[in-house]
Amino acid sequence: MSVQENELPQQLWPWIFKSQKDLAKSALSGAPGGPAGYLRRASVAQLTQELGTAFFQQQQLPAAMADTFLEHLCLLDIDSEPVAARSTSIIATIGPASRSVDRLKEMIKAGMNIARLNFSHGSHEYHAESIANIREAAESFATSPLSYRPVAIALDTKGPEIRTGVLQGGPESEVEIVKGSQVLVTVDPKFRTRGDAKTVWVDYHNITQVVAVGGRIYIDDGLISLVVRKIGPEGLVTEVEHGGFLGNRKGVNLPNAEVDLPGLSEQDLLDLRFGVEHYVDIIFASFVRKASDVVAVRDALGPEGRGIKIISKIENHEGVKKFDEILEVSDGIMMARGDLGIEIPAEKVFLAQKMMIGRCNLAGKPVVCATQMLESMITKARPTRAETSDVANAVLDGADCIMLSGETAKGSFPVEAVKMQHAIAREAEAAVYHRQLFEELRRAAPLSRDPTEVTAIGAVEASFKCCAAAIIVLTKTGRSAQLLSRYRPRAAVIAVTRSAQAARQVHLSRGVFPLLYREPPEAVWADDVDRRVQFGIESGKLRGFLRVGDLVIVVTGWRPGSGYTNIMRVLTIS
């Protein structure tokens, strides 16, 4: 039989749920041909022809309805369409290759959700100009309220990091550090802008006290490694273990050394004040080692910056060991795999990644996967196959956001890199085993008397039961949307808000599509709710993931203000 839009008898719903499951299972056991019968599995097209196309997302549907994770893997189909709307947010680092207004417009169109400014490089004047360009590019899409895409701005602090100086050849120069040669690592200020292949200046004055003979110094994410042979009055005499080309202002790592740098430097305090004055949405706090480092950042932001989200970057062994205490006081976590892969063995980075993503998912806090995701696209138009798998597996692990660094800051193909991450994420999201994920998250969730959280759990469960195309939530601060995201619905979460800051910040949460509603409140509360819900529906139609006949879950409050979300309804799109 064929079910037409808006003509579904109520008594057929139990049959639909059973049919979805049975058809998916028959792909494994019911097809002729014995154990290999799954090769002749029911296609998505056959399944949707049986059940009608208006009531659920079609992507990888047989796999989504599998009983076990192994069945789910067997039913994945390379010919299935990707998800219509990407759930994982894309963070792009803004630099010389991407800071023009026209290039930023292209990147927003390609899928950039959060623009990252790296304060390890550039002056305040430089970053102020970048912020102005980002906002101008984002506001160019504001002519249509339905298609307007809020873009968050994130400030990435320098943190207690160590960097090399400037080479005497100038800011764009490079020198080759040859394997087996001798290099002096010094803090003598006369070499700060006069570095060469034999002398490298670093900005950590106590380096001679914390590094022992035989210790290693890694430069530029470990591309260059030096072994300390002698500690002298002028600095550290080292032998090049692995050579390479050294540029300006490259990061330095001292594994196993007890670096005594403060959690926040004087420059960090100035940068955070700059962020508050320029209304940034997110702080990426670098080299967080313990909970007190996060508290120090919060104190530095002051009351004026209390609405800014703090995402702690885990980049060293101590941060991994104290992960739980850091997570408790943070708004989210970033896995900065570059420095982390130097501080701990490279073969253990994937373990740290999976652990951090899992714990963030359980806590319901955003988690960002960063560093070298599409590194080859700095110079090439297409990534390696290993890189595409890395991005996809970060999505499958449960990351809320995936980040581009040098690919967009200095690369030759910044727009193409964003497009590639967008395409990979769409395919990976279709392959997520949502049924198992939701059940595990629900079982692991502690008992709650918070009406908003209880309503969020019920809304996500209802979205699975009725195969809803979307969950529309009206939110003031973004908290309701984040709670819905916590339980990883298969349906898109359309968050309608009047708060521009909330609209930008909810990009940190997976599966949330923010809509900034600019109309003034109606005199009658119920009328205002209906208008905002309709605004969400119209935007969903425009973006292509809502159609006539689809079911949507609507989550609203019972009165104006934040903290009153406890009403859930089911609507049919007409």
Curated annotation (Swiss-Prot):
A cellular component annotation (GO) from this entry: cytosol
Annotated positions binding K(+): N118, S120, D156, T157
Binding-site residues, ATP: N118, F119, S120, H121, R163, K250
Activity regulation note: Allosterically activated by fructose 1,6-bisphosphate.
InterPro entries tied to this protein: Pyr_Knase, Pyrv/PenolPyrv_kinase-like_dom, Pyrv_kinase-like_dom_sf, Pyrv_Knase-like_insert_dom_sf, Pyrv_Knase_AS, Pyrv_Knase_brl, Pyrv_Knase_C, Pyrv_Knase_C_sf
Subunit description: Homotetramer.
Family according to the record: Belongs to the pyruvate kinase family.
Stated role: Pyruvate kinase that catalyzes the conversion of phosphoenolpyruvate to pyruvate with the synthesis of ATP, and which plays a key role in glycolysis.
Protein name as catalogued: Pyruvate kinase PKLR
